[in-house]
Each structure stands twice: as structure tokens, then as C-alpha cells.
Amino acid sequence: MAGALFEPSFAAAHPAGLLRRPVTRTVVLSVAATSIAHMFEISLPDPTELCRSDDGALVAAIEDCARVEAAASARRLSAIAELTGRRTGADQRADWACDFWDCAAAEVAAALTISHGKASGQMHLSLALNRLPQVAALFLAGHLGARLFSIIAWRTYLVRDPHALSLLDAALAEHAGAWGPLSAPKLEKAIDSWIDRYDPGALRRSRISARTRDLCIGDPDEDAGTAALWGRLYATDAAMLDRRLTEMAHGVCEDDPRTLAQRRADALGALAAGADHLACGCGKPDCPSGAGNDERAAGVVIHVVADASALDAQPDPHLSGDEPPSRPLTPETTLFEALTPDPEPDPPATHAPAELITTGGGVVPAPLLAELIRGGATISQVRHPGDLAAEPHYRPSAKLAEFVRMRDLTCRFPGCDVPAEFCDIDHSAPWPLGPTHPSNLKCACRKHHLLKTFWTGWRDVQLPDGTVIWTAPNGHTYTTHPGSRIFFPTWHTTTAELPQTSTAAVNVDARGLMMPRRRRTRAAELAHRINAERALNDAYMAERNKPPSF
């Protein structure tokens, strides 16, 4: 599924709206122009000369650079706001699953090398420049930092009445600079005090505990093969989970080398794999606990792509258990020695940079790989397709799809890191003109697959080694390489060079009918969410508006 559909006129004027209010734009840019001209006359010291500066000069340089950085951030957001205004607008495609907003977010994401979601967040933040022109003027002049502006934009997001927003903008612009160095919670309280004065129904109540239920998984730690986990649950669910993890942790024999905390953590992984018990780690065939099968490993498929010797690695005995005893401190111990971490009991074995990549893109070190193999993980050898002929159908075979996913590891759009497992296999040159061949196939998440298929502004060219060269609607080009190149530099992924394909006319009307549709347009969804969150203040407003009791 690849091709071209609509070529929107990106140069067309945006309908009247926040981004096209001449008064707002004049206020923001005129105030900023004089301030920025003065600011950039600051003589910032050369980094090589800082060693000759006194402490006062160093602190002054830090402050000046912070102002310049804030002004630059404001200008970056101004450019994002302008681009958003040019790309979005009322259109018959507003109910498309991949709409004009997504088109703009794709350009921002590629330019900043960030994810689609983060780019969309930057776009929402940029719109606050015109919602709050007086605050924006301070930001553009470097008098407010990006952190403070972001908090103001978030806390005032529910204010939609123009008069209340104007009063709030003036009040925040007058007082924000005098708040000084406050923590985020204190800044929120200071901002909320003004919102409560001018539009109490717009107070953010989304931090109510029940509404903040979430479970987050952090970025993998490539050295340790672990990832952070945090979140908020209903108290009853948390109690059940806590009790269940403890029960599973105590279900192993006394010879299990792991601590109780480590067993509880492993028990959560076992629950995720659908197990009702935690496999014992004693390694004894006659373990009295009878919990020998590790369901966590049974749910893992190891794709061998380069060096099969990694499969022979041995489990690390020091991955579990208590920390080794620290070296004793003596009167002769130096401060440097006291602060230096204790060495590991045994030096870790040297392995290739990466032997296993998880679906989330994290690296699993060889010792952990050995643990998974010992627990019964499935091993699959990825076959290189070589110079085989193209497959005669649209959908690639399982083996070909496996090669493409292992080669790419993630979505190939610039800045996107959706794991290949959850991506579509996209024909770079549209089928049937483009063959089902590894030199013409890549991973694309559903959002970017739709973007490329239904919007002709984006074009891509794929090279035999898997390199993809993207061209944005604005003419900028971005080159992405297969993710395996980073982790498996010796794996030869180059396949046959394909003849150049010709382009044919696309039946725009017919293909447009295939675009998935939204239940509500983005604008309608935004209005629904704002109204729903404002409704959380109804009880507060009713109590606040009660007449005096006398």
C-alpha cells in the first residue's frame, strides 16, 4: 500500500483564525523586534576564553545565554505556528485519520528529529503564542524561559473566552517576570490564582488522582537490559497487584539467588507473559517448588541476524542477589577511593555491541540473552533474501517480512521509533509498479504509511542497502538508515538493485475512499475534551457562586 493522492495547496492562504489575527501578530513581533535587536548585541564569551573569566562574568554569561536560548525557542515555536497555520484548515478531509494536522506534524517531526506525538505537542504549544500575545512578547524577548511559557500555555489551555483570555494574558505578562525561581507546582498555583479570578471554570482538574491513571515504561537501559516502570492505579488494583507479586515471589525455593525485590520485579514480567507462577532460579532439576518453566522466555522469539556465537553466551551469576559487600573504609582511604564505585566481583565478558534487540528497540546484553535461551525462548534464524527474484504478490511472505522488520527495527520515517513489529510493510515504489522485493520494502507505522499513501507531498526513494531518502512537501530531504546498521554493523543487508519504476496516474477519487475516517474531526474532539474537563469544575463553580449565607 503506497502511492499518491491529494496534493494540497500548501501555499494557499489560511482562513481567518488565531494564526492570522493581524493585531496579535503585530503586537508580538513589534515588541520582540526591539528587544531582540538589543539582546543580540550582548557579547557572549568564546568558550575557549571562559577559563580567564571571573565567577561574576561566568554567571552573567549563563544568564545571557539563557535569554538568547529562550528567544531562539520562541522563534522556533513561531515558525512552527506559521507552518501549522499554512497546513491546517477547514476541509472535506478533516475527518481523515491522517489529516492536515498530521501532515504538519510530520514536517515538524522530521525537522526536529522527534516523534510524531512530540511534534504535535510542539504545535499545540506554538498556538499559545497567539492566544497569549503579551506573554509571548516576553518569551520572544527572552524574559521568560521555555519552561515557564510551557507551564502557562498548559494551565491556561481551557480558557476559551476571548475577554477572559485577554485579561489573563495581561495579568500573567505583568506578574510572571516577578515570580522568581519557583518550582513547577508553585508556578502552577501562581498561574491558577489568576485563572480562578478571570475564568474559574478553566482550572485544570486533570490532576485528580483517578484521572491520572497511567502506566509508563521508560527507555531501556542498554547496559543493564532493564527499563524503568512507574504509574498510578486504583488503590484496589494496586493492593491486588502488590499481594499477587509477593505471593509469586515467595513461590520459589530457598536456593533461588534473587532477592525478594528482584523476584517481585520478575513476577510482573511473568504475569505479562500469562503465567500464574514465577519460575525458580535455582537451576535444580528437582526443585521442590515445581516452578521450573519460565513463561517469560517462552513468549520471546530470538531472531538471529548476525553473529550466532551470541547464543553460546553463559548466564551472568551476578545479575541477581544482593550487592557485593563494599570495601571497608580506613583512615588511609582517600576521598577519590571512597567515591569510586566498588568493582564487580568478576569482570563481565566482552561481547558484541548488541546481540538481541527487543521490540521496543532496547538492547539485551548477552548474559540476559543466555537466560532467555535457558528459559525456553524460541530461536529463529533470519535468512538473507540475497538476489532472489521479487515475489509475485502484494503481501510479502513471512520470511521476507521478517527480514525487512529485522533490518529496519523501527518505522523508517525521520524521527519515528515505532517498533517494526507494530509497523506495516510499505512498498517504496507503489505496487504493482514497484515489486515486492526487499530493496523496495520498508517498515512504516500506520500513521506515516497513511501519510505517504494519501498525501503526495511526501516522496521517498529506497536504496538497495535499505537507506531511505525522504523528500518533504517543503523540499527538504531527510535520509534514514536501517536500525540494524547501528546494532549489527557487520550484517550485510544490501539486496539487489532494482530497475527504476515509472509513475502512473493515480485514481484520486477511488483511492480517497480508502482512507480511514475519524469518529469526530480533530476540532470537534478538541472541543469535546475541553468541555469535558471544564465540566469537572461545575461543582466548584456552584459552590463558589452561592450567595452569602446572611
Curated annotation (Swiss-Prot):
According to the record, the residues making up region (Disordered) are 312-358
Q: Write out the entry's keywords from A to Z.
A: Signal
**What SMART domains is this protein classified in?**
HNHc (SM00507)
Pfam families (alphabetical): DUF222 (PF02720)
Endpoints of the signal sequence: 1-13
Record's family? To M.tuberculosis Rv3776.
**Stated name of the protein:** Uncharacterized protein Rv2100
